[in-house]
């Protein structure tokens, strides 16, 4: 199986459009805040990491133990490294760190920050407030990535915060077209529509299981020395 390729699946295309919309928004009228959300196993984290790497964005993953202070420290470190300003210790109160961070981002409006596992912030709402202040007081773009109920949780916690989000992108289960595109991108053996149907019926609606099935199909093809695989090759 070919490694390291990001297939242009429906979720990737939709998420790219949402990110580009935020980048090209009327900046003085709309804050740069968006949310990518969806069920586990649909490729949200893979997308977040790869778009950050490929476009030169900052990627930060929230941890369950993070407080407003530790988040401030982690984010400021990431911003300083991104801007080539060294790796010095970040000290001071949470308020002073956030103030200096907002000052940095105000001077560098091109910065884009991807924050994964935003669900952990729902129990530490000071983190959510800090993110809101960043997008309210600077032109930076912040893309939140969370689970399937993240959109509803934001609405329940703070309607004003919910309204600040300029775009919402829900990751969906892979379609047959997505499976065909992914298989064509990563499989090293040929296949037909029967294999696409086979995967679609067994992937539990997730990209993660789709990839596992593709790997198992390639293993069968390798053992049987096949250049093309069909459902009939899986029998017996």
Residues covered by each model-derived region:
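Conserved catalytic segments around the Walker B and adjacent sensor/switch elements
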Residues: 34, 52-65
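Conserved NTP-binding/hydrolysis module of P-loop NTPases
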Residues: 56-57, 68-89
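C-terminal alpha-helical "lid" subdomain
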Residues: 1-17, 31-32, 41-47, 84-88, ...
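Loop/turn-to-beta-strand initiation segments
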Residues: 108-112, 137-145
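Phosphate-binding P-loop
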Residues: 21-31
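Central P-loop NTPase core of STAND/AAA+ ATPases
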Residues: 81-108
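Conserved P-loop NTPase "ATPase switch" module shared by AAA+ and STAND
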Residues: 4, 101-124
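Short regulatory helix/loop adjacent to the ATP-binding pocket of P-loop NTPases
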Residues: 150-165
